[in-house]
């Protein structure tokens, strides 16, 4: 077997192995995300403070109704799920995901949270996702068989307390 054929065979095997292991977490269209909780009072009112506590932010539907949305606020494709979970050794870290199910990929089919397990689930395809400890990875349903994970967003600490969520 020639050197080129051996390299080609190795490259093919490598691609097959790595493609089976990766989770596709970019199925949701790239829509702007910016939610400003940059002062401590706003974070104390609308943030998440204990493991499994969550909130949904959907600007077009005014959820939550009394949140101070501005012209500079953007809540992604299907809305933003903000949940407190584990990041490293910290079990009280704010984590953010798009609310749209990556299997359905429609902005009006939104995930819900199971209050017993703190897993996100899709009411249409019934896929379930680990949003507290595994970066929105699929754990059952069609999302697992297709390796579709949730679109994650960045949660950055703000200078004056609180956080800012961005894409």
Regions found by a protein language model. Give the residues of each.
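Processing junctions and N-termini across compartments
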Residues: 14, 95, 116-119
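C-terminal motif of bacterial Sec signal peptides marking the signal peptidase cleavage site
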Residues: 15-19
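Cysteine-rich micro-motifs
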Residues: 117-127
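N-terminal pre-ligand scaffold of iron-sulfur
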Residues: 23-114, 130, 151-167
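A mature extracytoplasmic/lumenal domain signature
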Residues: 98-100, 124-126, 135
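Surface-exposed intrinsically disordered loops and tails
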Residues: 64-69, 135-139, 143-144
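Short metal-binding segments enriched for Cys and/or His
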Residues: 128-141, 155
């Amino acid at each position: 077997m020639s050197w080129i054929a051996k390299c080609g065979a190795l490259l093919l095997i490598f691609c097959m192995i790595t493609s089976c292991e990766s989770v596709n977490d970019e199925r949701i269209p790239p829509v702007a995300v910016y939610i400003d909780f940059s002062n401590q009072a706003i974070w104390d009112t609308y943030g998440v403070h204990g493991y499994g506590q969550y909130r949904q932010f959907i600007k077009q539907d005014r959820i939550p109704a009394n949140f101070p949305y501005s012209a500079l606020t953007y809540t992604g494709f299907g809305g933003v799920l903000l949940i407190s979970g584990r990041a490293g050794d910290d079990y009280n870290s704010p984590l953010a995901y798009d609310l749209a199910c990556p299997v359905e990929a429609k902005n009006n089919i939104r995930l819900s949270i199971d209050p017993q397990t703190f897993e996100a689930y899709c009411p249409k395809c019934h896929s379930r996702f680990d949003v507290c400890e595994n970066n929105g990875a699929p754990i059952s349903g069609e999302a697992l068989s297709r390796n579709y994970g949730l679109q994650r967003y960045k949660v950055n600490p703000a200078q004056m307390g609180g956080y800012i969520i961005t894409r």
